Swiss-Prot record:
Residues 78-248 form the Helicase ATP-binding domain. A motif (Q motif) lies at residues 47-75. GO terms for biological process: mRNA processing; mRNA transport; negative regulation of translation; P-body assembly; stress granule assembly. The keyword Ligase does not apply. This is ATP-dependent RNA helicase dhh1. The keyword Methyltransferase does not apply. ATP-dependent RNA helicase involved in mRNA turnover, and more specifically in mRNA decapping. Is involved in G1/S DNA-damage checkpoint recovery, probably through the regulation of the translational status of a subset of mRNAs. May also have a role in translation and mRNA nuclear export.
Length: 507
């Protein structure tokens, strides 16, 4: 009898053990990303996500999102954050900072409570959308509600949504303060306060708002700051508002190791011709092209479209709903090229971008660092090409010195091994719905990476929008004159652009 009971107990234990081993096999995990990675994300201590003893439901979301092992910043941050200690973390762009604070934040949420338990602040609307999506993706099995709120959208909609339980609030400082001041967003029992891109959030324009927001939180809150750069103002905030923070610095060098940087000296009027040459010679999966002004963004996007390449553009003057659509469609691979201002330099994670082009060279090292960090994400390879004119030569030298990096002259032929992958269709993309994902994957598989001219041709009508959606309509006469001056710099004849419409495919 005793032997029978022992055998039965043993079989039960074996069954439970087998069930424990099999749970991961039952997950709907994406195909493994086979691209090589640099030491920016592979130089780890060898920890696994299971070593953090987090909820099974959270691990399910992590693995189903395609995560395999924690990156260095995640290894350093997650165990400390789970204890509730304040954290000041500095790591390179594209090394997994977002998941480093999202995972412990999700772990500490009590889904049975209806109170807001975490506030995540970011400096831009696009980054707010992206961060909230990471929270929803990783926490999809936890039964929690994540809400994103930013300026440029209806305040009444946010007020209505806050009538329901919101466990994690992600937003830009101004809008969150507006909701908290009106008593709509209750942060009185919100123990977690996170700032991503903290150097930007603690700039003079945001600091007063941040300090007001902190006053709505309980005194025993946990404050976590994440950024690639930490100016002196961060130290002032740390001394004033943080309690014995655990400091993490993984910045042995500032630029990502997987990004190869080149410059090309070119006269202003020859820049478009140079860009056309780059498009014809490079194997671009997706590219982001940066300009220093919104006028130049629109004009360059129009010119690229006229050259026969698919192109979107985005800048701060566009309506928020149109910016959102451009961002969403570009992330999902609808278009190969995006022209933008510095609106998208911070935190935006688009795995498929393998080329960044600075059509206009930035004025400072911080902007340069954030721009080129849009390629080479999460330890992968990327290319940064800078078009330099005579006036930029001193900035080029200054940025090299400040970042401790070398920007080389562009060679006649660029080695494809530096930025091209054998199977670009396997690069992970955000999934909005399965049917859309299948359609995008099929498009990528059936389109040659070198045949860019016929991928979403500019006048096909698919993304040809009426004037007023990010076009020239509605501007003052002075802005139109400014646009005309910029147009002449690109080599357009006088009076070519009437200012009434734009043929660049935007939304």
């Amino acid at each position: 009898m005793a032997d029978a009971l022992a055998n039965q107990l043993n079989n039960t234990n074996l069954g439970e053990a087998n069930s424990e081993l099999r749970w991961k096999e039952q997950l709907n995990m994406p195909a493994k990303d086979a691209r090589p990675q640099t030491e920016d994300v592979t130089a780890t201590k060898g920890l696994e996500f299971e070593d953090f003893y987090i909820k099974r439901e959270l691990m399910m979301g992590i693995f189903e999102a395609g995560f395999e092992k924690p990156s260095p910043i995640q290894e350093e941050t997650i165990p400390v954050a789970l204890t509730g200690r304040d954290i000041l973390a500095r790591a390179k762009n594209g090394t997994g900072k977002t998941a480093a604070f999202v995972i412990p934040t999700l772990e500490r949420i009590n889904p049975k409570s209806t109170k807001t338990q975490a506030l995540i602040l970011v400096p831009t609307r696009e980054l707010a959308l992206q961060t909230s999506q990471v929270c929803k993706t990783l926490g999809k099995h936890l039964g929690i509600n994540v809400m994103v709120t930013t300026g440029g959208t209806g305040l009444m909609d946010d007020i209505i949504r806050l009538n329901d339980a919101v466990h994690i609030l992600v937003g830009t400082p101004g809008r969150v303060l507006d909701l908290a001041s009106k008593g709509v967003a209750d942060l009185s029992e919100c123990p977690t306060f996170v700032m991503d891109e903290a150097d930007k959030l603690l700039s003079p324009e945001f600091t007063p708002v941040i300090e007001q927001l902190l006053s709505f939180h309980p005194k025993d809150r946990q404050v976590m700051l994440f950024s690639a750069t930490f100016p002196l103002i961060v130290k002032s905030f740390k001394d004033k508002h943080m309690r014995n923070p655990y400091e993490i610095n993984l910045m042995d060098e500032l630029t990502l190791r997987g990004i190869t940087q080149y410059y090309a000296f070119v006269e202003e009027k020859q820049k478009v011709h140079c860009l056309n040459t780059l498009f014809s010679k490079l194997q671009i999966n997706q590219s982001i092209i940066f300009c220093n002004s919104t006028n130049r963004v629109e004009l360059l996007a129009k010119k690229i479209t006229e050259l026969g390449y698919s192109c979107f553009y985005s800048h701060a003057r566009m309506l928020q709903q149109h910016r959102n659509r451009v961002f969403h469609d570009f992330r999902n691979g609808v278009c190969r090229n995006l022209v933008c201002s510095d609106l998208l330099t911070r935190g935006i994670d688009i795995q498929a971008v393998n080329v960044v082009i600075n059509f206009d060279f930035p004025k400072n090292a911080e902007t340069y660092l954030h721009r080129i960090g849009r390629s080479g994400r999460f330890g992968h390879l990327g290319l940064a090409i800078n078009l330099i004119n005579w006036d930029d030569r001193f900035n080029l030298y200054k940025i090299e010195q400040e970042l401790g990096t070398e920007i080389q002259p562009i060679p006649q032929n660029i080695d494809k091994k530096l930025y091209v992958y054998d199977s670009p269709e396997t690069i992970p993309r955000p999934i909005s719905n399965p049917s859309q994902q299948r359609q995008i994957t099929n498009t990528a598989a059936n389109t040659s990476t070198t045949d860019r001219r016929h991928h979403n041709p500019p006048n096909s009508g698919q993304y040809q929008f009426n004037r007023g959606r990010g076009s020239y309509r509605g501007r003052g006469q002075g802005q139109r004159r400014s646009a005309q001056i910029e147009s002449n710099k690109f080599g357009h004849p006088q009076g070519q652009h009437s200012g009434k419409t734009s043929t660049a495919p935007v939304s």
